[in-house]
A protein has these predicted regions:
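Short beta-rich binding modules
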Residues: 1-225
């Protein structure tokens, strides 16, 4: 079967960075990252890897300081569990949102997709940071799940459009992550015209268009392991 997904006209190779769309991925690790603009807001970051890519493919080094070391066999990427960071807040309706409670709910959903709910319930932690570190140990591994990866586009200083990947919000339309081989799947199907899946950026110096279609020279996904 022939497919050009992930290829560029410049090289014909699959990119080492995973992109938007529907994929099977495994979770190599989970980090709980403080946002640079708000010390009370955190992102749950899933460090994912696709199924092994065959053919003329070279994945990123697992250790950037060891140029002769092993490489990832699949495409990799950092995926925010939610389009928005987790933070204590009060909605206009007056409803209070607890950061830690929402984080725990997210991990419950992920653990159930991986069939690891019992292990999650066995975790004992004194802080949310400790809880998330233990979740990373439990929920990372070789098991694959189906995901729908959305993104917020952003333009770098060289004018290339890149993707800040995230899992689209769970809604009546479906779920962004699901176990393999689920009967009556509710997995979201990626739709580039759905703003829940893709938040497009308007290219600078291109006032007449709100959609950027990269050329072979402008495939500028930045990824720093």
């Amino acid at each position: 079967m022939f497919s050009t997904k992930g290829m560029t006209a410049a090289s014909g190779k699959e990119k080492p960075v995973i992109g938007t769309g529907n994929h099977k991925v495994k979770i190599n690790s989970i980090s709980f990252d403080k946002t640079p603009y708000d010390a009370q807001a955190y992102n749950i970051m899933l460090h994912v890897e696709s199924e092994p890519v065959t053919g003329d493919f070279q994945g990123f080094l697992k250790d950037m300081n060891n140029p002769n070391g092993p490489r990832y066999e699949g495409q990799v990427g950092r995926v925010r569990y939610s389009p928005y960071p987790y933070k204590d807040s009060v909605l206009p309706s007056g409803k209070e949102i607890s950061r830690d409670t929402e984080v725990q709910k997210a991990m419950i959903f992920l653990a159930e997709a991986l069939d690891k709910r019992a292990g999650l319930d066995a975790i004992q932690a004194n802080t949310i940071e400790d809880f998330m570190a233990k979740c990373s140990t439990l929920l990372s591994g070789p098991e694959y799940v189906n995901v729908c990866l959305g993104a917020r586009e952003w333009e770098n200083t060289e004018g290339y459009v890149n993707n800040d990947l995230y899992l689209p919000k769970l809604s009546k339309e479906g779920v962004p992550i699901e176990a393999l081989n689920v009967e009556n799947s509710k997995l979201l199907i990626f739709d580039s015209n759905n703003s829940n899946h893709l938040r497009k950026v308007e290219k600078k110096n291109s006032p007449t268009t709100s959609q950027f279609e990269p050329s072979s020279a402008a495939s500028g996904d930045d990824f720093d392991l």
